[in-house]
Amino acid sequence: MYEYCSVVIKKYSKYTIPSFAPNGFCSMLEPPQIDKWQHLSTNCTLQFRVLLMDSGQVLIHVVLNNSTLLENIRLPLGDNQDLIQFSCKCPIISCKYISEEFGPRMLRRFQINLPNDIEFNRAIVSLKNLNFVLRTAKTSIAQNTITSQVLDINNGKKVNFAEGTNTSNYAHSNTQFQTQNMITDFSQRCQEKSEREPSNRSNITLPQDNFPIGQQSWPNTELNVVHSSQDLNTPSATQTVLSRPEPLNVQPSEVSQSLAKTTSCLPNIGNQKNQTETISDLLSRKDIAPCKPGLMEVVHLPKERVEKESRMHSTTGLVKTPTTTVWSLEKENTIRQNSNNKENADNKLSDSQKSRGINTPNRRTEIPLNGTLNGTKEEVSLGGEITVSVKNANRNASRKISKRLIKEKLKDKEFMNWVNKVETVLNKMFEK
């Protein structure tokens, strides 16, 4: 007997459940299960040996502590690819062979993990020289079977073996061993490579009782995450939610005051109506002239009426806004006695004004925002009858509208339509 090759083994793995294979390697076999493997690697000495016999046979042994045979395979030298096959991927060599030790043909598996590339290459060259079938293991198999990295446990762990000496053709010794370092790990094909290149491969460890597990920390890579939504605490993300304004109750006496406080103006229709209108026309008009501070149309009245106006200004309820005051061209006593005479007079004045507006160019009525007249004024002659100059620029006094006038205006459909439009405009402004 001649020892052809002998290498040291770092780890030995054995599949505990043989597969029934009546047709040899061509039989339909279930894939091996990871939890059916047993491993031995610590507190012992393991060797893989290839021996040549004088009878032309080959012996393959896996020896524990130079005395116990864990694998004892006897094969004819030469064409034996139907009896044994090897798969290799540095630093692991896997073997499967057909055994008839217990009668039916069974397929058994084992695998060895060599300590370095030198021992791995020595074993591969020896097997190739003896015409054994060696196949390169697929990478996908290694990735599916390697689930953990196992380190040697401390001294003091006991390993019990039942040594057996029964040998037969194509069979191994009936050796059983128990150890506390048996875990659910089949292949360590990438174990050594992971140790040499820790940065290229990360080892995944499974928790197991009574075993020191090799733990490898993952690198804490800081990722710059760009958030698609802004933080609600940042000033750019916080939005001021305006509360809904209270409903505005617009009364006929407050319409002109509300218009003066807003900066929104409706388009002018001066092409159809003259901008200088009488008192009744100003109340019933449906549009407001564009706003421009500093200019306003002034109606000139006699001095007697100016004095009456100044007295009435002190008792009105309108404040600090330039508004158009409603005045009749007839005497107040006549208006109080007969409202029909007032309407007739208003109609005459409106007709005369329309006739004058045909030949006069359109003029813009401009309302100052600050509530004062800046000295610029336009003079309007109403039918050539009355011309009054109002020189008081500041109208800060309050004004009063009589109940009778309010009742009359509430009955006026055109005036009420205009009030409704003003209310609609104001509501839209507050909604914005």
From Swiss-Prot:
Keyword S-adenosyl-L-methionine belongs to the record: no
Annotated GO CC locations: chromosome
Region (Disordered), start-end ranges: 333-373
Major location (coarse): nucleus
Keyword Nucleotide-binding part of the UniProt annotation: no
Pfam family, one: Meiotic_rec114
Compartment list: Chromosome
InterPro entries assigned: Meiotic_Rec114 (IPR004354)
Bias kind Basic and acidic residues: ranges: 343-354
UniProt-listed GO biological process terms: reciprocal meiotic recombination
Keywords: Chromosome, Meiosis
Function: Required for meiotic recombination events; not required for mitosis.
Assigned protein family: Belongs to the REC114 family.
Protein name: Meiotic recombination protein REC114
Source organism of this protein record: Saccharomyces paradoxus (Yeast)
Gene designation per UniProt: REC114
